[in-house]
C-alpha cells in the first residue's frame, strides 16, 4: 500500500496543546511542572545522550508547550550533543539512537535552525536507502524510531521516508504482533512502548492518510486488550505496578481519544484511572517512582525512577489537558 502526503501536518503536531506562551492553570499542568522540575533536580545521568534522556526531553518540551513554563534544560542538552545521534558505528541504524532525534524535532519548535535536524535527516535517509526493513527488532522501536521517521517525512514531504518507515512497521508487526490477542509482547511495558509510538505517529499524520488508518487499527486492537490488563489500583505493569508502562498506555489511550481513533466513552475512564495512579507514584517533591527497568520482569519499588518514564508521564499529562474540565 502506498500513500501520498497531500496535507502537511503542522510541525510538532503530536503536541495537542495551548499556545506555547500561554500558561494553563489546572491540576494536570501543575503536577507536570512539579514532575519535570523534580527530575531535572534529582534525576541521575542527566547529561548522557541516550534513549532514556531523549524520551524525557521529548516529554519536557511537551510540558513547556502545554504550560508555557520552562526549566531551560532541553536546549542545553541538545547543544551539548551537537545535534548528533549517539550512533554505534557497528550498527548505525539501530532504533535507540534515533530517539534523540525525536527530542531534537521537539526542540526545533523553538529552535528551527536547519543544523539541529541535519544529522537526524542524514541518518534516516541513509537507512531508507539500504532497502532493508528489519532493523527494528523489538516493539520498542515504535517509540524509538517511528516518530522521528514520521515527523521528518511529514515536514519534508518525503514520501520515500514515509513509505520506508511504514514497511519497517509492517515487518516488525509480522514478526512480533499477535493478531489474536492484540499484544506485541507478554511484557506489558513492551506493549506500552508500542502503543505510545503508534499514537505519536497517528497524531503526526494527516487524517486521510492510509498509513495513519493502519496504525489506528493496530492501536485499537492493542487498546482493547490492554484496558483489561489495568490493575485495580490503576497501574499497568509486567510484575506489579510500573509507572513507565502506566504512563505510556495512559498517553496512548488519551492521544487516541484526542485523535478520534479511540472511543472517548470507552477509554476515558481508563485514562483517568491511570493518571490518578501515576499521582500516587510521585514522592513529596514530585519525583516519579515505581519505574520498572526497560522491558524488565523485575518488580519496581518506590525509589525506582528513570527519565524515560518521566517523559511519558509528561506526554500523558499533555494529552489529559484537553480531556480535563477547567484546563
What are the language-model segments listed below?
Residues 1-23:
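Secretory targeting and sorting signals
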Residues 24-123, 137, 238-327:
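CBM-like carbohydrate-recognition segments
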Residues 8-9, 17-18, 145, 291, ...:
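Low-complexity, intrinsically disordered/propeptide-like segments
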Residues 139-143, 150-250, 262-293, 304, ...:
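Extended ligand-binding clefts on enzyme/binding-domain cores
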Residues 83-186:
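Extended ligand-binding groove/face enriched in aromatic
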Residues 44, 108, 133, 150-154, ...:
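Short amphipathic alpha-helical segments at helix-loop
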